[in-house]
């Protein structure tokens, strides 16, 4: 192959990566509890009446607005709701809580073990989606920022996800 063709093909091969990296950025704004919109608080309190809201963030990306609202239940357990604004109304799109790995369904544990990845989770986040899917985010020791594996569970079927779950 001639040098110009090789260079052109190489440039085209990395172009999508560069374009993805330059995609829409997420603007994150910390929101004081007293400043959370009443409509957001109302949706959260309807889902978890006993929750004490501790903190919130507004996330804006392209034309989407999310609120992440974190709090504590009366039993001391922590919970987080992710809300998306749709047509001027707020709706919960995900509910998250930390669980012990031993508390995860056996099918999820077995699916993770069968994946061939040697992960012993030190943190597990259970993320319930509004469509009935539950995502288990498994964090390995020394890697607190991103899950090392995600396993989905729906209708009695579990699978290791090849891509990061979008919410």
Outline where the language-model segments fall:
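Long, terminal "pre-/pro-" and other extracytoplasmic accessory regions
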Residues: 2-7, 11, 16, 20-167
């Amino acid at each position: 192959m001639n040098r110009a063709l090789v260079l052109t093909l190489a440039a085209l091969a990395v172009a999508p990566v560069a374009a993805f990296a330059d995609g829409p950025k997420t603007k994150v704004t910390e929101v004081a509890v007293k400043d959370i919109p009443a409509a957001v608080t109302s949706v959260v309190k309807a889902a978890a009446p006993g929750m004490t809201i501790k903190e919130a963030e507004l996330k804006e990306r392209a034309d989407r607005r999310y609120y992440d609202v974190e709090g504590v239940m009366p039993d001391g357990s922590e919970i987080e709701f992710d809300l998306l604004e749709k047509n001027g109304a707020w709706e919960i799109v995900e509910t998250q809580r930390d669980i012990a790995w031993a508390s995860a369904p056996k099918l999820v544990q077995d699916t993770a073990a069968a994946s061939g990845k040697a992960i012993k989770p030190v943190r597990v986040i259970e993320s319930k989606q509004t469509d009935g899917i539950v995502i288990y985010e498994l964090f390995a020791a020394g890697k607190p920022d991103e899950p090392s594996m995600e396993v989905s569970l729906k209708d009695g079927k579990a699978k290791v996800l090849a891509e990061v779950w979008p919410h």
